[in-house]
Amino acid sequence: MSRSLKKGPYVEGRLLERVEKMNAANEKRVLKTWSRSSTIFPQMVGHTIAVHEGRKHIPIYITEDMVGHKLGEFAPTRTYKGHAGSEKSSGLR
């Protein structure tokens, strides 16, 4: 279910302030954030935002295709290392 239109998209206020300040100063640096639920706005395009995934921050370069998505979609929280192999299948044939 999507968010109500009268509320508008969610973005952490401090994150948007920092991005707009960087746009005004025309500087590019990595912004750290824990706000995985923030929506990506057009002002963020071209910036690198390090999104927390539970252990560390994963740097994500924002492109135009990402606008409208959430930051957390691009920083997976679970690692899949594959199913355990059975000893029976590893024997000689």
UniProtKB/Swiss-Prot annotation:
PANTHER family noted in UniProt: RIBOSOMAL PROTEIN S19P FAMILY MEMBER, SMALL RIBOSOMAL SUBUNIT PROTEIN US19M
GO cellular component terms listed in the entry, alphabetical order: cytoplasm; small ribosomal subunit
Similarity section: Belongs to the universal ribosomal protein uS19 family.
Organism taxonomic ancestry: Bacteria, Bacillati, Bacillota, Clostridia, Eubacteriales
GO MF terms, alphabetically ordered: rRNA binding; structural constituent of ribosome
HAMAP family documented for this protein: Ribosomal_uS19 (MF_00531)
Gene behind the chain: rpsS
Record-given protein name: Small ribosomal subunit protein uS19
Organism name: Desulfitobacterium hafniense (strain DSM 10664 / DCB-2)
Alphabetical GO biological process terms: ribosomal small subunit assembly; translation
UniProt cross-references to InterPro entries, sorted A to Z: Ribosomal_uS19 (IPR002222), Ribosomal_uS19_bac-type (IPR005732), Ribosomal_uS19_SF (IPR023575)
Entry function: Protein S19 forms a complex with S13 that binds strongly to the 16S ribosomal RNA.
